[in-house]
């Protein structure tokens, strides 16, 4: 009996040990399988990564080949244009030779006329003697009679010849001018996109709209105050709209908002930080835009400050037309026409590119954009003939050179193209600019921003010099001056903002 008990206990012990061993074997196998799966996943991930890198390199190579093809095509077009220009120059040379031949014919006609006059004088002498013999007239009386008859007869012929030649020359000159202008316009036929007063910023999700607004709207108020741009948030999915008549302020605001959305941290301090970074980016973009404009127009050797001012024109519009694109267009048109007429094309392009340079700062300085532009050009070393082109394209001075006339003509061509400018948008922008100018004319005003499509103006004042009572009076005075000097629909809200900041650092 005892032996059975011992045997049963031994069997149980052996069964336990075997079961424990099997469990340990299964655990070890499970760990090995898990390690194998992990290694396999890592291997597949590396293969996917390598494949993505290879595909990326292939895409870069493809894009590079497309770029080289496009560049080759553009170079071929340029060579074709140069060949056409050479042919036009040859045609112009032949026409000049024909004109010289006609001038020679005129000289020959003039010589023949003088010869006939001498023959008339000889006949007059013979007639004098005959009249004196036959009629008993004095020499003076006979001479006066003959001269009067000859004068009446030949003056009529000479006047008729002069009129015919004048009409012929004027007709040919008009035809040639039309050909020159048509050829210049055909050589430069750019695409044009009208400027608008809004920009859109895409959002990763509609949840971001709440973060942009902030607690009780503090973020959106800070953003609009710092940038001077309306931030419009509506039901449009994953999009917000920035509205401002000033393209420069709108671009800075767009970059600021995109940086905030990408960063994800949106609060007043972060808004100010991103705004400063956006301003630096736009300053860099302005410089690059100016350099690109000089390259497109083929103008070299400009002062760096003039290049920077050209870049600012990228963010200015005139009747809905971008001023920088307009300046490049005027430069190229003037250069083409100068080449056709055998004039200085480099000088014409330089004057055309700089003719509206004053518009880069005319909001900051007193005077017309032509006067301001001439002052800037003189300050940065431009020659008097270029300065004359700037002043004469709107008639403030008489053109000193043929190139100045071409710049004025190119300016008119660019502005008069159908669809190039829009009157209503320009009037709206001028009204908003006038609104800001009125607010800035008051003492202690630092900045002024017209927002809400001109229905509200926010005025930021110096906090150390304006208290609450003076702020209320300033708002009243500004509103009264706006009522006197501007016409506007509905009610216009004037908001005076004074903010005092004290900053200290704990070390």
UniProtKB/Swiss-Prot annotation:
<feature type="transmembrane region" description="Helical">
    <location>
        <begin position="1"/>
        <end position="21"/>
    </location>
</feature>
<dbReference type="GO" id="GO:0004521">
    <property type="term" value="F:RNA endonuclease activity"/>
</dbReference>
<dbReference type="InterPro" id="IPR004088">
    <property type="entry name" value="KH_dom_type_1"/>
</dbReference>
<feature type="domain" description="HD">
    <location>
        <begin position="323"/>
        <end position="416"/>
    </location>
</feature>
<keyword id="KW-0694">RNA-binding</keyword>
<keyword id="KW-1003">Cell membrane</keyword>
<feature type="domain" description="KH">
    <location>
        <begin position="197"/>
        <end position="282"/>
    </location>
</feature>
<dbReference type="InterPro" id="IPR006674">
    <property type="entry name" value="HD_domain"/>
</dbReference>
<protein>
    <recommendedName>
        <fullName>Ribonuclease Y</fullName>
        <ecNumber>3.1.-.-</ecNumber>
    </recommendedName>
</protein>
<dbReference type="GO" id="GO:0003723">
    <property type="term" value="F:RNA binding"/>
</dbReference>
<keyword id="KW-0540">Nuclease</keyword>
<dbReference type="Pfam" id="PF01966">
    <property type="entry name" value="HD"/>
</dbReference>
<dbReference type="InterPro" id="IPR036612">
    <property type="entry name" value="KH_dom_type_1_sf"/>
</dbReference>
<dbReference type="InterPro" id="IPR003607">
    <property type="entry name" value="HD/PDEase_dom"/>
</dbReference>
<dbReference type="GO" id="GO:0006402">
    <property type="term" value="P:mRNA catabolic process"/>
</dbReference>
<comment type="similarity">
    <text>Belongs to the RNase Y family.</text>
</comment>
<keyword id="KW-1133">Transmembrane helix</keyword>
<dbReference type="Pfam" id="PF00013">
    <property type="entry name" value="KH_1"/>
</dbReference>
<dbReference type="InterPro" id="IPR004087">
    <property type="entry name" value="KH_dom"/>
</dbReference>
<keyword id="KW-0378">Hydrolase</keyword>
<comment type="function">
    <text>Endoribonuclease that initiates mRNA decay.</text>
</comment>
<dbReference type="InterPro" id="IPR022711">
    <property type="entry name" value="RNase_Y_N"/>
</dbReference>
<keyword id="KW-0255">Endonuclease</keyword>
<keyword id="KW-0812">Transmembrane</keyword>
<dbReference type="Pfam" id="PF12072">
    <property type="entry name" value="RNase_Y_N"/>
</dbReference>
<dbReference type="InterPro" id="IPR006675">
    <property type="entry name" value="HDIG_dom"/>
</dbReference>
<dbReference type="InterPro" id="IPR017705">
    <property type="entry name" value="Ribonuclease_Y"/>
</dbReference>
<dbReference type="GO" id="GO:0005886">
    <property type="term" value="C:plasma membrane"/>
</dbReference>
<keyword id="KW-0472">Membrane</keyword>
